[in-house]
Amino acid sequence: MTEDAREWMTWGDLGVAVEELAAQIESEGFRPDAVLALARGGLPAGGALAYALGVKNMATLNVEFYTGVDERLDEPLLLPPVPDLSLLRTERLLVVDDVADTGRTLALARDFCAEHVGDVRTAVLYEKPQSVVRCDFVWRRTDRWINFPWSTPAAVAAE
């Protein structure tokens, strides 16, 4: 994949995206009681959105699907530890990820949460046209591969 076939997000873009997503969420009247960030890509946006929305209750859900650029497992997998969402049965939960590409990771997380939580909404920085999930809150739509500032540098530790 050529560099010009990619979309590049900067840390500054993340700040703008979070402000705009928070404004969307507020304007819809959705007041989440908790934010669930999908690890690992959703952690920066999830944490920043929790701050922007004044939400102190946060959790993470580890989902493995992508193994490289355009490389993925057959199915997304929930990885331990899986949060106990039973205390949120009547609460409002915002599930946050960086991108809904195929949407299968977000669908797995949303469906898992819907079994335990009263009202589940989804927010992403980017949504792609082929996503099987139509997110409730989206900053940008694109069909390009996205380079995020937290995942673009090469890993320090050898795998």
Question: Can you say where each PLM-predicted feature lies in the sequence?
Answer:
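PRPP-associated nucleotide enzymes
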Residues: M1-E159
